Amino acid sequence: MSRTIKIVTLFALFAWLSPASAADAAKPATQIATFAAGCYWCVESDFDRVKGVLETTPGFMGGKTEKPTYEEVSSGATGHAEAVNVTYDPAVVSYKELLDAYWLNVDPLDGTGQFCDRGSQYRPAIFVYNDEQKKLAEDSKKAIEDSKKFKEPVVVEINAVSAFTPAPDPDFYKTNPIRYKFYRAGCGRDARLKQLWGDKGGH
């Protein structure tokens, strides 16, 4: 094969490979989803069980105060919700699958708190990062509404992300397992989730 033919062949090969390589390079290795469903201890625990989730970070989102403390958020005065940033591998688990997991771990009919925890800081919400997440979240909510599974309205908010403040007690369910189990059982979370979603709900 002549040198000219070799060069032409190599250029053709690179041209064929480049679009796929560029697409792979443009796709982020990890992505983030943010969910609120009451106490972030429980939400963190629930998503850590999902295959493809790499990290969960509990904190506060959706309020008006910059870098609020736990005590400020707990007062309900800042407008924040307890939320969890979920870092995941989209090659293993899709955003739609994370939404499916979210719905099975939230009371979608209670907009003033979740389970035994009351107040706007415990309100359920899906915080979206882009138009694709927004559409998928809205579609998932509409699917539940259209299913007529519940007589009451689905009140989970779908909001754009805002500043996120990490909480002071990450991995509480790991560092304080006995206290966490007593809290979760006493709050009636899993009992209510099974009432809403059957065996798929809760732990």
Predicted regions and their residues:
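Bacterial N-terminal signal peptides
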Residues: 6-19
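Flexible coil/turn and secondary-structure edge motifs
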Residues: 2, 21-203
